[in-house]
Amino acid sequence: MKKSHIVSNIEKYYLNSLTKEVVWNLVGGKATINFATETKDAVGQVVFDMPLPDGDLAIYSTDALLRLINITSEEIQIELSKGPTGLVDKLKIQDNKFDLNYHLSDINSIPEVPKVAETDYDFNFKVDDEFITGFLKAHNALEKVKDVTLNTTTTKQGENVVEIVLGERSQHSHKVKFTELATFESPSDILPFSANVLREVLAANKGTEGNIYVSNKGLMKLEFNSEESKAKYFIVRQQ
């Protein structure tokens, strides 16, 4: 098993510590992880290849799990270990040097993930590495501002685009604006979202092309699919 495969998919829900407590649902050689950020402004699901026996694993401290995995070499083995009760209570992680144990938690200690009521989306656009790199650079240049707004418009050349503005839209604030080609039927409202959450989602999925769908009701959906994993996120607008 490749360490990089495991780490990259954990990071898709961990989002640089925005989510720590999750349940890994193992079925048919795949792990399905539903999650919510601690601030409850985003929920999502990550599905990836994980050749382990079927069952549910309660991960209370994803940051501790990542720290353990990150000291290993690229080729690792992961096994499930049962305690005296016959229930799985540890993840055993091994490489050619280390034998590591990660203690699993009681599944009832993991908060339930809120359900998302999807709606019709008013515009959508594609994202790739060029978009992600540009967004991260702009966010860093503004010292990781909290605000990002999106709205659609049609250029003088007749192109439908989404305008993305990092920073406050007030006249005297520092901000970065850029556009991407978008699909929509009518112009949208100006919709505010968390720049920090969007940043971490994009950073965790760098290297995978995706799509962003936005509703004027204040819901953003992001989807990233590859041969080995699928990631889906819902971010709610800021007030």
Which positions does each model-derived feature cover?
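DNA polymerase processivity clamps
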Residues: M1-Y102, Y121-Q239
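Charge-dense, extended regions
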Residues: D99, I107-N108
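Short, charged, solvent-exposed linker or helix-capping segments at domain edges/interfaces
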Residues: Y102-H103, P114
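Long, charge-dense
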Residues: N108-E118
